[in-house]
Amino acid sequence: CLHLKGMFLVMSFIASRKFTLQDQQLFAEFSGDFNPIHLSDEYARKTPPGKVIVHGINSLLWALDVFQSTGDNILDHLFVKFLQPIYLDETVYCNYYPDAQVIEISNTDVVFLRLKLSGNACIYANSISYSKSTTELEVSDLDFSDIESLERIEFIQSADPSYVKDLYPALFAGYGCPLISQISCLS
């Protein structure tokens, strides 16, 4: 149960999985994020986490994908907190708290990501335009319209849609490649 301001909320289990090195490599190819902390055991051993960690945006997109597969289509504003790193081959669970409109990724002891949903979907493939920009933005200040102007969006936008569909099938069916591309460029 999620404890929120003196209330306990009922959880609805959605899915579980283990992120593998192959998952990381596929996401890196799609997003352009080849940071070795996500791909190399040798490199990761020399970092504070000490082992390879899952791309945070990959875990976010997975949570959105499994949520989308439930049929609840509430995506307008996303408030995301990455609380702890997820390590490769660690079993994690995606849980949904419908009363609070919260999705969490956790294991039995630790919450790794908390996602607050609100609103109705309003992003359509035909309404989004992409352009290059050198404007620097803090991730905390971004909304979907800001993301369109980030430089890496052109790289991600060029991804084969069938490739994106394989990575996040329910999210792709519900929103298409543009939303997934916009979120991926934050990685």
Segments the model singles out, each with a brief description of its role:
Residues 9-19, 72-147:
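HotDog/MaoC-like acyl-thioester-processing domains
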Residues 1-10:
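Short, Lys/Arg-enriched N-terminal segments with co-localized hydrophobic residues
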